[in-house]
């Protein structure tokens, strides 16, 4: 499931703090020994916004040439699709031993926006190399932004968190970049909870996450309920922003291509 920060704006925030110093204890750690990546599986999520069924998100997991490969598609449906068209596809590769993101590819269709984005993580140069093409505006941009020796991104971050110890009451921080300067994300392991979704009932570990710096600071908060087992499946996710709350419920799990 994509860990996409809500897009809200707070008037009190100033661009003068857009380049904060990185937080010293923010780092990406290796997965715990008994974590099980959902190889070859496809998760389908129903998406609700306020009282409406808003769309569907599908996530497929596999491994390509020794690299973890995750593909996410998100589509608005029903009345919400009439109000606001969404057809997004996000694809990432990351290292299974280190959890470091290697590449991110995004196709964005949101409202009238049509954007193609490619991000390559160059850990030798400590740069995120971004190339973006705005199809409607017919312009392109190329950026190279500083990153630490290992980062996650909007897709791999949710998997990264699930691969960690998740001891109740603890907090940890990690850097994430979708091609821009890395932001530090703080995760709080809030507790255990029984959750029922269309795919079944689960004993879960609930965590919350929010950006400590960067462009998404103060613009929303994310909660994820992970299955309390070796799989650490994201069975439910809630994103809260000024325009409301979006909830993802795990509806179906399929194995195979």
Predicted regions and their residues:
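Hydrophobic, well-structured mid-protein blocks that either form specific transmembrane helices
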Residues: 115-161
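Acidic, serine/threonine-rich low-complexity disordered tracts
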Residues: 3-123, 160-257
């Amino acid at each position: 499931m994509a860990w996409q920060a809500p897009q809200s704006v707070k008037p009190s925030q100033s661009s003068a703090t857009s380049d904060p110093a990185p937080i010293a204890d923010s780092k990406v750690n290796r997965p715990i020994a008994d974590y099980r990546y959902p190889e070859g599986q496809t998760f389908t999520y129903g998406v609700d916004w306020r009282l409406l069924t808003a769309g569907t998100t599908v996530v497929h997991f596999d491994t390509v040439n020794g690299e973890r490969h995750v593909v996410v598609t998100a589509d608005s449906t029903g009345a919400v699709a009439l109000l606001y068209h969404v057809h997004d596809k996000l694809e990432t590769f990351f290292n299974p031993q280190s959890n470091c993101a290697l590449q991110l590819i995004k196709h964005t269709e949101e409202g009238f926006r049509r954007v193609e984005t490619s991000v390559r993580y160059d850990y030798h140069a400590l740069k995120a190399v971004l190339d973006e093409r705005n199809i409607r505006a017919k312009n392109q941009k190329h950026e190279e932004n500083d990153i630490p020796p290992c980062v996650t991104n909007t897709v791999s971050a949710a998997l990264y968190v699930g691969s960690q110890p998740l001891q109740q009451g603890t907090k940890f921080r990690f850097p994430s970049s979708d091609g821009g300067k890395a932001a530090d994300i703080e995760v709080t392991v809030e507790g255990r909870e029984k959750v029922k979704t269309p795919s079944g009932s689960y004993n879960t570990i609930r965590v919350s996450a929010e950006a400590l710096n960067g462009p998404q600071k103060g613009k929303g908060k994310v909660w994820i309920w992970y299955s309390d087992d070796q799989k650490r499946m994201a069975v439910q996710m809630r994103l809260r922003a000024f325009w409301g709350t979006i909830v993802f419920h795990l509806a179906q799990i399929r194995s195979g291509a």
